[in-house]
C-alpha cells in the first residue's frame, strides 16, 4: 500500500462576484422615474403605488417623487411606495 496520499488538486480557490443587493434609496429621499429603489432576490419588499418590479424582482420608481416604506395587508408584507413629486412634501 502507498504510504502517502496522491497529490490531488485543491478544492478551494474560487469565489462568486458580489451581487450588490439591498435598498438603494431610503424612505424620505427623492427619486426620478426609472431609478432602482431595491435590488433583491425574491419578493422581500413588494411594489406599492407608483413602483414597478423587474424580472429579477428589482423595484423601481414609475414616477418622479418621494420614496416611502410601509406594511400592507393581513400578512404584514413590507411595501415600497413613491409619492408623486407634485404631491410630495418638501424635504
UniProtKB/Swiss-Prot annotation:
Return the annotated region ranges for Disordered.
1-20
Q: Which molecular-function annotations from GO does this UniProt entry contain?
A: structural constituent of ribosome
Give the record's keywords alphabetically.
Answer: Ribonucleoprotein, Ribosomal protein
Gene Ontology terms describing biological process: translation
Instruction: List all disulphide bridges recorded for this chain.
Output: none
Query: What's a Pfam family this protein contains?
Result: Ribosomal_L27
Gly residues compositional bias, start-end: 1-10
Q: Where is the signal peptide?
A: none
Per its record, how is this protein called by name?
A: Large ribosomal subunit protein bL27
* Encoding gene per record: rpmA
